């Protein structure tokens, strides 16, 4: 499916619309996970309705990650240079770490909790090598052995690095890549894998609906806005947690 921009509007959702859905649901989730969580923990807010609101926001946030997983696999498929793509993810992993720790751990550095860009980078590193293997052999058995070993290696790395979504996140991304030719099957598998981390990931299945409506067009040129938004919004939430709660 082509991702080229086109002047003719296709029915369905563009890549930009998917990104906005992911950003909005992610922001709702992170607002709850950082600001509301610390407010509740510090008895800054004690009304019982806030706890219900907190959980509702976390459930809404489950929609974001499957969309990001789908967009990552699309990026791996259509990027001109997957190694540059990996480097970009790695740079933003480093940029995002202090804001992430501020927002989630009320600390400037927490060795036991790394941001999701590390998870994405590990998965993309595995996918990049899978693509190289695919170029060198057409034997299904060899390809599948490489897929399993690379997915396992990246997942183990995520587990020991304590990345966001841990090994489950990496497995979900690798599965989405391996099954990419069937979008719905890929995302059903992805969301099922995410259930390993928490029963709340049942809400992740909602993301399949907008993904199914994706029409293959990128939309506008806002690539770096979506990258910078992640550390920027975490920094804002982190400052609120650090100085106002």
PLM-predicted stretches and their roles:
Residues 1-245:
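Alpha-helical transmembrane segments and their immediate juxtamembrane cytosolic regions
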